[in-house]
Each structure stands twice: as C-alpha cells, then as structure tokens.
Amino acid sequence: MIMPQTRLVVADNTGAKEIMCFRILGKKRVAQVGDIIVASVKEAVPRSNIKKGDVVYAVVIRTKRTIKRKDGSCVRFDDNAAVIIDKEGNPKGTRVFGPVARELRDKNFMKIISLATEVI
C-alpha cells in the first residue's frame, strides 16, 4: 500500500536512489503493484540525468504489503520499490534490480518484465 508521502527505493539504473510519492494516478487512495504514481526524487547519484527534486512518473514493482493472488498464494517483499518511467510507460533505465511481481504482466508493463532478473 503506497500512499502520498511514502518513500520508495528506486530499483533501476536511472541515477535516482529514493523517491517520495505525492500523487497516485487514477481514482485510487493507495497504490498497489503495477500502479503508476507521481513522485519527487529525494536522493540521487551525483552526475546523473535525474537530479534531486525532479518530478518523475514511476510504476510500483514491489510492496511490503501482502499481495493475494487468485490461486490462493500470497507474496510479500522486503521493501517498497518502483521503476521510473516516461509518459508513454517505457522505463527510463536499462536495468531493473531485484525481483518483480508477476502482476506487472497483467498491467502490460512487458518492458519492465523483460528487464527484470527475476519475476515472482
């Protein structure tokens, strides 16, 4: 469950390390895996394309909140993580670190799925 003011780890190589959500796109109060959020960069690597204070779009790829699946299984991750995307929904980075939830496939984020090392 990602709400406004929630800080997320950035799981790609764009140069941002941490972002803070301040808007969830769509008519939702909380964001789950696969939802698009608008966030502000709170921590960034020096000399990268994305600077601290930049406003970015991101898609949530991992949450600490348990994800219940239709087959009865439950999945939970150790951190809240997101991947920075552009307005068309393509990831800005070329690598995705850590596992990614399978729910992204249902939301048609195939590019992120293909960049991920592990899909759970």
Swiss-Prot record:
UniProt key word Translocase: no
GO terms, molecular function: large ribosomal subunit rRNA binding; structural constituent of ribosome
Matching Pfam families: Ribosomal_L14
Keywords on record: Ribonucleoprotein, Ribosomal protein, RNA-binding, rRNA-binding
Biological-process GO terms, alphabetical: translation
Keyword Ribosomal protein carried by entry: yes
HAMAP family (UniProt xref): Ribosomal_uL14
Protein name: Large ribosomal subunit protein uL14
Gene this chain is encoded by: rplN
